[in-house]
Amino acid sequence: MSELHYLYGKPTGTADLRTVNSDFIVKEILPFSPSGEGEHHLVHIRKDGLNTVQVAEMLAKFAKVHPKEVTYAGQKDKNAITEQWFGIRIPGKETPAWIELNSDRLTVLSSSRHSKKLRIGALLGNRFILTLRNVTNVEDIISRIEKVSQIGVPNYFGEQRFGHDGKNLVLGRQMLAGKKVKDRNKRSMYLSAVRSHLFNTVVSYRLTHYGTRPLAGDCVMLAGSKSFFVTPEWDLVVLKRLIEKDIQLSAPLWGRGKMLPQGEAAEVETQAMADLTEDCYGLEHAGLEQERRPLLLEPQGLKHEQTSDGLVLEFILPAGCFATSLLRELVDYQDVKELQWQTTLTAETNVVTESNTAAANVSDNGESAS
């Protein structure tokens, strides 16, 4: 992520993120209210130090159903406190006593029956409450908050999408080159990493060379939807819609089909992807269709408060957008939980290396003596 373009220049303020799980709070916002009847149970859960899959498995075991009967709208971080909805299909059975699941790491906030399955992406957005500790140059951060509130930030896919040390991108490229991956969820995750990297590359290239100005032939999206249309030329009517944020500039989620923008915008995207032709080819032949994603991310209700713990940020992002992509424009932060993971991994690797070296020395000594 460090090589991607900063819209306001690299921040001069620094801070620690996720010193403890409560420094990173996420609350899902559903686009509907549970109907109160039906064979699907919607359970609203607060989890601390658990990932989404772990909770889904706990729910399946408790309800005595197959894990495939448990669904969720999106995955949430493990190293955080998150409030998330789960759907469990339990036809013809009484409502389980969900509250019995409560523990020091999991709390059932509410539950209700619903008539429809909870599907991936069925979210209006997420509310974030982040606490930054050991903050320096807070004046620069606050100045950036004001700019971000007006213009937004690059809508990059965050580091989480690519896995630790970018391994999902590496494995995705290996898969596109022919390596077999049996697990369906892993295949999807690896494909998504390659596609997301391509999107980030195009966004960074465009912002580096052209800023946020519109280009002839742009493919623009209707705000709040996935619908889009091409603008061969920017007349005053269309430009007014962009200024009023009724439409948004976009970048490609690559797949098969002809390039959607035209003219100058198409040329810019082609230039940006010039070194990624193998990624493009692989995604086209993986069965993905071309889609678009907004170029910029505009947070709602972005506010800050200085407390005894540090600087607290609160904002709402649309589903599928990353808080860390917003944060990187505000402050040069270090993720404490990620650093702890890296330290543990390095220590474990050193132990294995030392063990292997010792075993090799014993083997060498044995061969010399024989």
From Swiss-Prot:
Superkingdom of source: Bacteria
Any Gene Ontology biological process: tRNA pseudouridine synthesis
Active site: residue positions: 77 (nucleophile)
Protein keywords: Isomerase, tRNA processing
CDD domains: PseudoU_synth_EcTruD
SUPFAM superfamilies in the cross-refs: Pseudouridine synthase (SSF55120)
UniProt keyword Isomerase present: yes
An annotated GO cellular component: cytosol
A molecular function GO annotation: tRNA pseudouridine(13) synthase activity
EC nos: 5.4.99.27
Catalytic activity of the protein: uridine(13) in tRNA = pseudouridine(13) in tRNA
TRUD domain boundaries: 152-297
Coiled coil: none
EC primary class: isomerase
Described purpose of this protein according to its UniProt entry: Responsible for synthesis of pseudouridine from uracil-13 in transfer RNAs.
Family to which this protein belongs: Belongs to the pseudouridine synthase TruD family.
Name of the protein described by the UniProt record: tRNA pseudouridine synthase D
Classification lineage: Bacteria, Pseudomonadati, Pseudomonadota, Gammaproteobacteria, Alteromonadales
Protein's gene: truD
